[in-house]
Amino acid sequence: MNIMLLGAPGSGKGTLAEKLIKNQGFNQMSTGDLMRKEINDETPLGIECARYMNEGRLVPDEVTMGIVKNFLQDNHNQLIFDGIPRTLNQAKILEENLIELNAKIDKVIYIDVPSEILLNRISGRLICPKCKVSYHIISRKPKLEGICDNDGTELVRRPDDAPEKVKVRLEAYANETAPLVDYYKNKPGFIHIVDNANTTAEEVYAEVLGAL
């Protein structure tokens, strides 16, 4: 079985993916990791990918999906697709690639969270720069305010998590992903999970397991 996760930053996709990997034997496909490997191996696609990145340009869909296709040749089962596809064009290319391999996306899980909740979740995040553990000023407070429980390091907020930048990220995500939700919602296996302020990660995970 292959699963795709759709949801805005702060929707809990990462937490859900971790639980599915740990408890259900899935593997997560990271486009970023795949690109870095192709670049390090200096493959033709990797060289082309590096050229676009070095020029500060977006990597075209044909390059990104070419790298994904190479990975799928030997890995096309028990996968979690998160962060790919990002566009409708990528979704169609991915579907074609999987058909060639006699594989498919079995379930598309869309975690739908109101924008005001996302804003509060993300802008309230604090990170330990040493151990990378994440905290939250409301829902996951450290024992000592502003200090990591593990190593006593002062917690920081990532620049991208500032409220004004979060709003920009959420707007960009909405514009980018709305067509994907529309594309998949009429296909078999689409799961729509509404996550409100009171929904826990365990409740989302339980609902997903019940639908798989």
UniProtKB/Swiss-Prot annotation:
GO terms for molecular function: adenylate kinase activity; ATP binding; zinc ion binding. Gene3D superfamilies: P-loop containing nucleotide triphosphate hydrolases. Keywords: ATP-binding, Cytoplasm, Kinase, Metal-binding, Nucleotide biosynthesis, Nucleotide-binding, Transferase, Zinc. Zn(2+) binds at C128, C131, C148, D151. It catalyses: AMP + ATP = 2 ADP. Residues 124-161 are annotated as: LID. SUPFAM superfamilies: Microbial and mitochondrial ADK, insert 'zinc finger' domain (SSF57774), P-loop containing nucleoside triphosphate hydrolases (SSF52540). Pfam families: ADK (PF00406), ADK_lid (PF05191). The keyword Calcium does not apply. One of its GO terms (cellular component) is cytoplasm. Its EC number is 2.7.4.3. InterPro entries: Adenyl_kin_sub, Adenylat/UMP-CMP_kin, Adenylat_kinase_CS, Adenylate_kinase_lid-dom, ADK_active_lid_dom_sf, P-loop_NTPase. ATP binds at G10, S11, G12, K13, G14, T15, R125, S134, Y135, N198. Pathway: Purine metabolism; AMP biosynthesis via salvage pathway; AMP from ADP: step 1/1. It comes from the Bacteria. PROSITE patterns: ADENYLATE_KINASE (PS00113). Transmembrane segments: none annotated. It is found in: Cytoplasm. Monomer. Catalyzes the reversible transfer of the terminal phosphate group between ATP and AMP. Plays an important role in cellular energy homeostasis and in adenine nucleotide metabolism. Consists of three domains, a large central CORE domain and two small peripheral domains, NMPbind and LID, which undergo movements during catalysis. The LID domain closes over the site of phosphoryl transfer upon ATP binding. Assembling and dissambling the active center during each catalytic cycle provides an effective means to prevent ATP hydrolysis. Some bacteria have evolved a zinc-coordinating structure that stabilizes the LID domain. This is Adenylate kinase. The lineage of its organism: Bacteria, Bacillati, Mycoplasmatota, Mollicutes, Entomoplasmatales. The gene is adk.
